[in-house]
């Protein structure tokens, strides 16, 4: 059985994502695979290439032939040079870590709060909060007055 290492296309229209697979050379491009050994996402900047190096080395050692596209990917990751005994290529470009949007928003909010010092209550809520204690204090006074008035009558 002739075994190939090739790309299996996934993803949407105009957004290709590939899996690097080990497959029989007679199967169709997106057909059944023997093993999945990596992923390739060309639309990301820099493009994502993840390869299970030990499995690729095994399949190359037992005679699997990489397609042209997969061979170029293996050259970028250094797996092809490792198989052929050549010096390793320069390291891949790594994407900078993304800033968490929520954390950035909270940092901006804290900075804005520092400028405004203490956050104030909206006018309506503040008015309701002040009005509520006055009604509680007013209620006992009216009961005392009512009790004093009823004592005079009784």
UniProtKB/Swiss-Prot annotation:
One of its GO terms (biological process) is translation. Residues 127-144 have a biased composition (Basic and acidic residues). InterPro entries: Ribosomal_bS16, Ribosomal_bS16_dom_sf. Residues 111-154 are annotated as: Disordered. Coiled coil: none annotated. GO terms for cellular component: cytoplasm; small ribosomal subunit. Residues 111-121 have a biased composition (Low complexity). It comes from the Bacteria. Pfam families: Ribosomal_S16 (PF00886). Keywords: Ribonucleoprotein, Ribosomal protein. GO terms for molecular function: structural constituent of ribosome. The keyword Zinc-finger does not apply. Belongs to the bacterial ribosomal protein bS16 family. NCBIfam families: PRK14520.1, S16. This is Small ribosomal subunit protein bS16. It comes from Salinispora tropica (strain ATCC BAA-916 / DSM 44818 / JCM 13857 / NBRC 105044 / CNB-440).
